[in-house]
Amino acid sequence: MNHNLYLNMKRQIILFFSLALIFVACQNNDQLQNKINASLLKVKNKFAKDTRITIHSVSAKIENNSIILFGETEHKDSKKEIINSLKYLNLKIYDSIKFLPKIENINSIGIIRISVANVRSNPEESAELSTQVLMGMPIVIRKISDDWFYVQTNEKYLGWLSDDSFVQLSPLALERWNKQKKFFITSLFEIIREEPNEKSFPVSDVVAGSIVAIKNYFGKWVFVELPDGRTGYLPINSGKLFDEWKLNTIANASSIESVAKSLIGMPYLWGGTSIKGMDCSGFTKTVYMLNGIQLSRDANQQALEGNEIKTDTNFSQLRKGDLLFFGRKANKDKPEKIIHVGIYLDSGNVIHASGLVKINNLSPQADNYSERLRKTFICAKRILPEKLNILEV
């Protein structure tokens, strides 16, 4: 055999077996990665079924016959469970998972200082609007990225706030703020002014649901302090003492209808939860909040609250104030998916935010009939008469 031909064949055989070994190793790594990912998912489903309200983002990679864990979680037990679930693989495990909150040298509690603060999905102004938080509401700081803070709202929702949206409070300042009497804004929109007259320059705007501290009364005006220390005057009829409002506010079908109808024509805003703009669940959340009941943020979260009401094609079992949920019905290929919510009024009428806050009807005979709503109806939940998650600040 020609010597060169022999060497060439030998090189090809070596190359073939080398590639085969690499292929087998890659397959083994892929299988191993799949096992690791399955363990991570199992732990996630146990400790953080909803990452909109729970911090848990853990990944793993395989390097040099070892497992490297990285990411973050708010559950110490989840870290332990992840490591224990991977021990059977008999590989060295490097734990680089961060435990949150781990905030050093800052005050971890903040109070919203502007009428409506925009919470975003990522730390940049161009990021998707996730939700909004109103003036006077507390937030918990979980982590920081430059001028952005990853925070948790009072309904547990997570997202990013810019640093000028809120004021961080020391324990002493927080105690002082909490001890002050609060004024709860019931008007849809109002201006805090420098002096007690309507021609005075503005200090800030406020919207329904905003909370400020009350300092004194001046005839038809009330002297208030904002969370960041700014002061000014509000018309006395723009709100009520918060403790009195909370004590005397009794949510019922009529009050739900009244507040809901007062928002007719308000613009739709994805991620909005204020009178400046609201999405479907932001609308229902706002209506119930102004009646003293705190709902979860998103439609599919709200669908987990209250008592389910069985309905027929005439919707005769529904009562005013019930929440109606819409979306994709379950089929053999896909699970049920709730994407819209509205409030039932009467005679088939549903008030909801879609483009703007409006009333549609579920009956084909009605002038304001919505075929889309009827075809996508999934379920109804009754929040009243039970008072769930009473609004706290």
What label would you give each PLM region?
Residues L295-I359, Q365:
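...with weaker cross-activation on analogous glycine-rich loops/strands in unrelated enzymes
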Residues A260, G272-N291:
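Active-site nucleophilic cysteine motif
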Residues I112-M135, I185-I214, Y268:
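Beta-loop motif signature
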Residues N84-K102, T153-F184, N197, E225-V259:
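Boundary regions of SH3-family modules and the immediately adjacent low-complexity/disordered segments
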Residues Q168-P171, E175, E190, E198-S200, ...:
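Aromatic- and glycine-rich peptidoglycan recognition patches
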Residues I68, Q132-S162, S204-I236:
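SH3/SH3-like beta-barrel superfamily modules
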